């Protein structure tokens, strides 16, 4: 064998080994995410739906749960996509010729972006509708009852839904792009239809993030306050615990001996009051057992971190708005080739990259908090071991829409300079200056408004409670109803 043939063979072997290595790494990453999501979903599913007398119903619910687990794993992968790419770029910059990180390259990152895009399309368009129709189906009339009959009905329903959505998107694309090519795009299903449909879904997710993230940023302060032990400077915990235990014992006595009282009792109301008192007592015991560091330092530091992260997010978006007016390069754009390890995507180097990753995760958590806090989606909030299968499907779809829009959301707001890879950068609306500019301005305005309205009121209430001023005898003139009552007396 001649020398050129040996060189060609060695190059082919190297490409083959790199491709196999990328497949193994991608499979291991997905398997890890899948296991984590399966453990997470089993904590929220309703056990009665999987232990029913009808084996067909239990089998259908198990299949639907596996599809939801797959979708949630893709959603988690979409969340980790941009932070993993930013960190990988900084690692390659710091260790360019390290033997142990040769597996980390641009081809792997680009492949992960393409896989997330592909499976996001697959989950949103096929798997989740299939799971929903599968759980709701009963089989065609006259057919044999069982899983196979439900599969036939689900496939027919899914085909009809696919034709309906395909026709609607084709008509919409023909109206928007009024030319012959757009009308003939129905035949170019893979290259035009799916990216266009996913572009619409991504735009919907970005709009949803625009609404939920400012609301979540404002709600993060109250949510963190519920999770941490708040400082109380002028209060006696022992006295509050004694009063709570006394009230709980009195309510328990009334529930156990309802005949001892001559008034009619609302047992449901008494049970709710008892549950509230038990919850309050548990919180008081938690605060009593907390250390002085947790009581006096942990809560203020957490509030300060939230305030710094929120203020930094608004500041970065404000700077990005100015850059949009000055420099055309600030517009989000796609990048077909992943050229990693050449230049840092932050002006502050590795520290700036870490800040970008922290901000991306913080905004994603805030958007989820805002999503479940909004009145429109509050009914979707999952409950521990009491979430129906259809509700799990709805949660997985919403989380996938939010998470798949996170890379576009972060790049549109200028939180990172990392350009969108693969089909994520092919969205037509990303090149529209007015959409991007108005989106940034709306985010900055809504976030500032929510913070000013919520944070100031929360801080004022917390300071009043911290110093015990809420229990002080206030002047009667501050309360109109009370003043009128005293005047009548």
UniProtKB/Swiss-Prot annotation:
This is Protein LMBR1L. It comes from Macaca fascicularis (Crab-eating macaque). It comes from the Eukaryota. Belongs to the LIMR family. GO terms for cellular component: endoplasmic reticulum membrane; plasma membrane. Residues 43-66, 136-154, 218-305, 372-388, 453-489 are cytoplasmic. Plays an essential role in lymphocyte development by negatively regulating the canonical Wnt signaling pathway. In association with UBAC2 and E3 ubiquitin-protein ligase AMFR, promotes the ubiquitin-mediated degradation of CTNNB1 and Wnt receptors FZD6 and LRP6. LMBR1L stabilizes the beta-catenin destruction complex that is required for regulating CTNNB1 levels. Acts as a LCN1 receptor and can mediate its endocytosis. Keywords: Cell membrane, Endocytosis, Endoplasmic reticulum, Membrane, Receptor, Transmembrane, Transmembrane helix, Wnt signaling pathway. Dimer. Can also form higher oligomers. Interacts with LCN1; this interaction mediates the endocytosis of LCN1. Interacts with UBAC2, FAF2, VCP, AMFR, ZNRF3, CTNNB1, LRP6, GSK3A, GSK3B, FZD6, DVL2 and RNF43. Interaction with LGB and SCGB1A1 is controversial. It is a multi-pass membrane protein. Residues 1-21, 88-114, 176-196, 327-350, 410-431 are extracellular. Residues 1-76 are annotated as: LCN1-binding. InterPro entries: LIMR, LMBR1-like_membr_prot.
